Amino acid sequence: MSAVLKQRIRYKPYLDKIRTAAQCVDLFGAKPNQYIGWSGFTGVGAPKVVPDAVSKHVEENNLQGHENWRYNLFVGASAGMEIESRWANNNMIARRSPHQVGKPIAAAINEGRTDFFDKHLSMWAQDLTYGFYTRDKKENSLDIAVIEATAITEDGHLIPGPAVGASPEIVHMADKIIIELNTKTPSFEGLHDINMPVLPPFRQPYQITDVSQKMGTPYIPLDPSKVVAIVESEFADVVGANSPADEGSKAIAANLIELFQQEVKAGRLPENLLPLQSGIGNIANAVVEGLADASFKDLNVWTEVLQDSFLDFFESGNLNFATATSIRLTEDGFKRFFDNWDEFSKKLLLRSQVVSNNPEIIRRLGVIAMNTPVEVDIYAHANSTCVNGSKMLHGLGGSGDFLRNAKLSIMHTPSARPSKTDPLGISCIVPFATHIDQTEHDLDIVVTEQGLADLRGLSPKERSREMINKCAHPSYRDQLLAYVEQAEFECAKSRSLHEPHVLKNAFKMHTNLAENGTMRLDKW
């Protein structure tokens, strides 16, 4: 037992439950169809050594695909990519939900080896506590929860690390709990505000009217009798370096900042805007970087995930406070974060995903939501999950939680992406989205590097022109306009002009991409 481990465990009865990861392996092969819950969100705060030990056992004993070693795996969002990828490669994941990242798990899903379902993240953790996902179990519970912590309180409760996610709900639903105490990571104590699940009809309103407001506990409460093992982990989270913002992302950010300036001038937003939500990726980083350099002051953030760019945002003096459920930082970002702990910790709070993504709070605060889709169609239906309607990427995540309930709902995307044979082979503005996650009723603004389509109050026919003229790539504008004109001509005959489509051509750009490597058509 290391001195750091002993120091971090302030509940002394747990000292008798210290085990190695290898000593926990037998719990996982006890019976088929086990339900397993992990901590973690967007690749940080997930368990590492126990899942790795289970993988090693499966590999050494040629147990890949054995029914006792295939699991229903639930994580608040994506877990550590390396760990989950190893499970996927060993055919250990029978069912997965609600969000994942990594080529092996995506391959398992799209090849039919793993059943996957996604869900709005605020609803997923809630539905877990309703027993919706364990209906075939007599106990209606999770068999094992493996939760990363950075400290344990005097009463045996958990201090999470850089992610809260669905850990409170997973702990609540678990029969057995394994705590991975990460001594490589400094303690995050004081950075959390945790609310445990309360089921209807006893649920009360979330008394949050400001991003910095607390209403929970600084730890995850649990029943110490459920804890079967404490395992030391000495491995830091691994997050890849962020790609620098390209010119397209910077142009999108500039278009958004111009919109905010216009909304302030028109009196529809206050001078310090309203709480901001931003996803992850190059465009999201460019937006945050642009806001850090812009003239807006005293900004607040209510979001899911904070990336390295938010550290610059804090240091610019323009950001007052941020709430999230995960801090997804690179190695350099975490070092910078802990080197400036006294400053950053005063301006940051980590909550569960049920709270960070809660529609009640998002609507009350008037959040400005910004997310990136796979594609958006001319009537502003957005696809966030399934390429060509069939191939799952990662899952819905929290985009729907925010976009349905925000005061200002924004989707930003490049106007076009390269295919294998054409540098502009994929238009992100299409006649009809091949899968719809966000409907036309959810979006206010669509932004590309070409411009910004303000869709508020527009009819579908008006939206189609706005989308094509403002957001589509020039290589596709005439083609898309020709589709709209053809659709309006045909639908006029049948008196169905509200949202005109030519069904035989609605997906022709997608089929042409599959057959010819580009969405650019010779003719409709």
UniProtKB/Swiss-Prot annotation:
Matching entries from Gene3D superfamilies are given as: 4-hydroxybutyrate coenzyme like domains, Acetyl-CoA hydrolase/transferase C-terminal domain, Glutaconate Coenzyme A-transferase
GO MF term set? acetate CoA-transferase activity; acetyl-CoA hydrolase activity
Catalysed reaction(s)? Answer: acetyl-CoA + H2O = acetate + CoA + H(+)
Which keywords does this chain's UniProt record carry? Answer: Cytoplasm, Hydrolase
Q: Can you cite a GO biological process for this protein?
A: acetate metabolic process
* Name of this chain's protein: Acetyl-CoA hydrolase
**Which EC main class describes this enzyme?**
hydrolase
Keyword Acetylation annotated:
no
Q: Which residues form the active site?
A: E304 (5-glutamyl coenzyme a thioester intermediate)
Grouped into one coarse class, the protein's main location is: cytoplasm
**EC numbers on record:** 3.1.2.1
Q: Which organism is it from?
A: Yarrowia lipolytica (strain CLIB 122 / E 150) (Yeast)
Q: Which GO terms describe its cellular component?
A: mitochondrion
Q: Which family does it belong to?
A: Belongs to the acetyl-CoA hydrolase/transferase family.
Q: Which Pfam family, giving just one, matches this sequence?
A: AcetylCoA_hydro
Its annotated function is as follows:
Presumably involved in regulating the intracellular acetyl-CoA pool for fatty acid and cholesterol synthesis and fatty acid oxidation.
Where is it localised?
Answer: Cytoplasm
Q: Does the keyword Cytoplasm apply?
A: yes
Q: Which domain of life is it from?
A: Eukaryota
Positions that bind CoA? G279, I280, G281, N282, I283, G398
